[in-house]
């Protein structure tokens, strides 16, 4: 009888653990361009459409590429901001300006309409695993 009880307990635990995989996740890579030129500065913001959740942010690299790891799958809204590297931070004491990640001369502004994922009109559909999504702003 003790063996039967242990077998039943092991089965219940195994079935319970089988459902603990969590929500499927996506990795996303791509390149951001504006009128065909890569953005050298800024961030890409992704927000799952139609559901609760926090936006995730990836930094744009000097060659215009970005990468997200482990974000929710499904229909996704996108925002893009291009931070001006020439902006001087207000510093205190002996603090120094951090060096830019790319030549500040490569920076150019983009329309502010792209900054909010909910209003930008930019979207993609993500599936579990690796995804590629280039963002071409006009």
For each feature predicted by the language model, list its residue ranges:
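Short, surface-exposed beta-strand/beta-hairpin micro-motifs centered on an aromatic residue
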Residues: 63-69
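Structural motif
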Residues: 29-39
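Extracellular beta-sheet/turn segments enriched in Thr/Pro/Gly and aliphatic residues
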Residues: 97-138
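Short amphipathic beta-strand segments in non-cytosolic proteins
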Residues: 42-57
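Short acidic/polar inter-strand loop motif in beta-rich domains
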Residues: 84-91
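A short, solvent-exposed beta-strand micro-motif common in secreted/extracellular proteins
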Residues: 74-84
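Bacterial signal peptide processing site
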Residues: 20-24
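Sec-dependent bacterial lipoprotein signal peptides
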Residues: 1-18
């Amino acid at each position: 009888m003790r063996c039967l009880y242990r077998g039943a307990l092991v089965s219940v635990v195994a079935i319970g653990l089988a459902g603990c995989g969590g929500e499927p996740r996506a990795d996303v890579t791509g390149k951001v361009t504006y009128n065909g030129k890569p953005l050298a500065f800024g961030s890409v913001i992704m927000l799952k459409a139609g559901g609760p959740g926090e936006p995730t942010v990836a930094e744009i690299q000097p060659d215009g590429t970005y990468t997200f790891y482990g974000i929710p799958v499904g229909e996704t809204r996108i925002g893009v901001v291009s931070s001006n590297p020439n902006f001087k931070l207000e510093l205190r004491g002996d603090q120094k300006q951090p060096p830019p990640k790319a030549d500040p001369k490569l920076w150019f502004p983009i329309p502010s309409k792209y900054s909010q994922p909910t209003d930008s009109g930019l979207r993609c559909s993500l599936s579990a695993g690796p995804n590629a999504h280039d963002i071409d702003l006009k």
